[in-house]
Amino acid sequence: MAASAMGVLQEREVFKKYWIEHSVDLTVEAMMLDSQASDLDKVERPEVLSMLPPYEGKSVLELGAGIGRFTGELAEKASQVIALDFIESVIKKNESINGHYKNVKFMCADVTSPSLNISPNSVDIIFSNWLLMYLSDEEVERLVERMLKWLKPGGYIFFRESCFHQSGDHKRKSNPTHYREPRFYTKIFKECHMQDDSGNSYELSLIGCKCIGAYVKSKKNQNQISWLWQKVDSEDDKGFQRFLDSSQYKFNSILRYERVFGPGYVSTGGLETTKEFVSKLDLKPGQKVLDVGCGIGGGDFYMAENYDVEVVGIDLSINMISFALERSIGLKCAVEFEVADCTKKDYPENSFDVIYSRDTILHIQDKPALFRSFHKWLKPGGKVLISDYCKSAGTPSAEFAAYIRQRGYDLHDVKAYGKMLKDAGFVEVIAENRTDQFIQVLQKELDALEQEKDDFIDDFSEEDYNDIVDGWKAKLVRTTEGEQQWGLFIAKKM
């Protein structure tokens, strides 16, 4: 334990030395470690602030406040801001810039110090921007526990980190920064629990996780990632997201699906059907595409790389987005990813040229409301393309009904599905029954899987192999009997 503690103390000194070295020039360029900082700051700062929950009249704790890029903006609306940084010259610079705000308290303190005294249940929002990457794994874990205590019930933690690799172009003699995988942060925050003196149990619920769009646009870089968490009762129902990530879309399940569908894909036909369907969209360079239920991002990378479009990929599954972000490393394409519930998102009118969704909307119970949102979000002349599981008209058999229930699906026949799009205001609606193609693709995937049985079992397990094979055979039975169908839908906004 003593050796471990000594190592942590030494690492803390390394980080302090690193930031003293990079705080000689107290400028935005020095703080962001980037020669383009001034231009980036103009678009990135408003974007980051837009991700926060409402903070008017709230108490905000800003950890790693630096020279105050965000302090003044927070002070404009918050009732109180505590701006904290562990480099004295930096926090003094912040005070010289923002000291005229009487609702800001400036503190020179280290977030890892046990002597840092913040009262329990006293803060509405904890905000940090590039902080945790300068802490050890153990320090991150301890800080998350303390932050949960400092927050009022219902309060929020927002943080943003550089993941995978550095983004700034400043030359550095050494770089002790921890460029972690996003799933490291997600796991630690998700697993943090506490009990207060009254016996109430609390945990953190993920509200959102996304790339910083300014970095995707300017640097084709998805490694700037933000999270928003809320302090909730441990008994609160976490709903559909937890169901997805703990059952159908566990990490291992996603990897199994990808093995069947091909690298980057977790939906029917993988790259082959993606090429066919995307070719129907007449995509033009610079157009903006929303992919609803983007999975692990293969279709988004394909569109961005081959058609030079900008893609926003959203998925409710934290695990899916974690994989998508990892797959984006080094691709240098204009794709943003976000953990989001499409039924709760609200984009401005006329935001997208295309909305694309593959075998996802089967999870959505109120499709008419979602299609009305799609219509609103599309630009005039914009297109929607959806492939989805459907059912034959009439009452399903007991077995198929049980399958639908177990998966939590909401299925319609192809004609009814097309009518829902028409009723939402779309024109030129094409509703095609593609079940024959679905059967061919299923059989092809099953044949390929059976041919590489030994390799699959080596990489996963025999149980995993049997699970996938049985699932594909069951789908083939349901589709050949005509109960389960597959629809392709294309429609246009006038």
Swiss-Prot record:
Transmembrane segments: none annotated. Pathway: Phospholipid metabolism; phosphatidylcholine biosynthesis; phosphocholine from phosphoethanolamine: step 1/1. Keywords: Cytoplasm, Lipid biosynthesis, Lipid metabolism, Methyltransferase, Phospholipid biosynthesis, Phospholipid metabolism, Repeat, S-adenosyl-L-methionine, Stress response, Transferase. GO terms for biological process: methylation; phosphatidylcholine biosynthetic process. Pfam families: Methyltransf_25, Methyltransf_31. It is found in: Cytoplasm. Monomer. Catalyzes N-methylation of phosphoethanolamine, phosphomonomethylethanolamine and phosphodimethylethanolamine, the three methylation steps required to convert phosphoethanolamine to phosphocholine. Mediates a key step in the biosynthesis of choline, a precursor of the osmoprotectant glycine betaine. Has no ethanolamine- or phosphatidylethanolamine-N-methyltransferase activity. This is Phosphoethanolamine N-methyltransferase. It comes from Spinacia oleracea (Spinach). The lineage of its organism: Eukaryota, Viridiplantae, Streptophyta, Embryophyta, Tracheophyta. The gene is PEAMT.
